[in-house]
A protein has these predicted regions:
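Non-heme di-metal
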Residues: 1-322
Length: 322
């Protein structure tokens, strides 16, 4: 039995965890942008946000929609073609489908707030380099596939959007942009699951090929270093007008460094937990992000509160709550 051996019959599943922990959990968490009330956000945008804050939020949201399209393509085209197992392919197609929901939802946020220049972020150097870093890793053989999958799952799904997620969600601490904040919460939950299962799939590859972890090591470290530089440049770009109330650029950089270390360990490189130096106190000032989005570390969005991973709105009327 191998991940790369084609199986024609639908069942029995050889790797059932990709159905139960991946496809099923994502299916149970289906949501749409139409469930998110935005009237309060429009009022906040027009009456309460400063010009620098509007520029910050606008630049982030415009980039999100395009990025999610690339992420969706990775799951539905690359992962599906590499692993000829129904349970893995179904999970990948479900994840890719969810990314299209993200893209539509971000587009909805953009249009609701009057942000419709979707090509603007493609002309921005710092943002474009970050975008290219997400989609530039490819592979057509086991080592190449392993490197690509690890980089994509750990860093594209598990790190690259989190600085922007945190910035947007910080407005929630000020009782602003609650619709945007709700979408960030659901998106973080989805991305956390995608990253977790992609990292699991890479570790599964390493279990079946005991040389793979070492063969991929240097390239994965190099990719993590590249990702760090891109993220820090992106953070500088976001904060070019100064720190935002409730969050500082320096703290966010430490938060990202800590996440990179955690993701390296999640891939199986347990000796790299301290590879990127960071200030613990500064990184910990972002702990509110995990608490508000439903988890307490980068891996336990579902383990701590498993009932959270079900139908997204759970019958709540968010207009009544807010």
């Amino acid at each position: 039995m191998s991940l790369f051996d084609e199986r024609i019959p639908y069942k029995p599943f050889e790797y059932p965890e990709y159905y139960t922990e991946g496809w099923l959990k994502q299916a149970q968490a289906f949501w749409l942008h139409t469930e998110i009330p935005m009237s309060g956000d429009v009022k906040d945008w027009n009456e309460k946000l400063t010009i620098p804050e509007k520029n910050l939020v606008g630049n982030i949201l415009l980039g999100f929609a395009q990025t999610e399209c690339a992420v969706s393509d990775y799951w539905t085209q690359k992962v599906v073609s590499w692993f000829p197992k129904h349970e893995i392919q179904q999970m990948a197609m479900m994840f890719g489908s969810q990314e299209t929901i993200h893209a539509v939802a971000y587009s909805y946020l953009n249009e609701t707030l009057g942000l419709e220049n979707f090509e603007a972020f493609l002309q921005d150097d710092a943002t474009m380099k970050r975008f290219n870093n997400l989609v530039s890793y490819e592979g057509t053989y086991k080592v190449g596939i392993g490197k690509s999958l690890a980089v994509f799952s750990a860093f594209a799904e598990g790190v690259s959007l989190y600085s922007a997620f945190a910035v947007l969600y910080s407005f929630q601490l000020r009782n602003l942009l609650k619709g945007v904040g709700q979408q960030m919460k659901w998106s973080v939950r989805d991305e956390s699951l995608h990253s977790k299962m992609g990292c699991k799939l890479f570790r599964h590859m390493c279990e079946e090929d005991d040389k793979l972890l070492d063969d991929c090591r240097e390239d994965i470290i190099a990719a993590a270093t590249t990702m760090l530089k891109a993220e820090e440049n992106y953070i500088d770009k976001m904060f070019e007008s100064g720190d935002v109330e409730g969050i500082k650029a320096y703290d966010l950089k430490q938060f990202i460094r800590k996440r990179l270390n955690e993701k390296l360990q999640e891939l199986g490189y347990f000796d790299l937990g301290g590879y990127f130096k960071f200030e613990e106190a500064a990184a910990s000032r972002l702990d509110w992000f995990y608490h508000l989005t439903g988890g307490h570390t980068h891996t336990d969005f579902f383990a701590v509160r498993p009932t959270d991973y079900s139908k997204a709105n759970e019958g709540e009327d968010f207009e009544d709550i807010w």
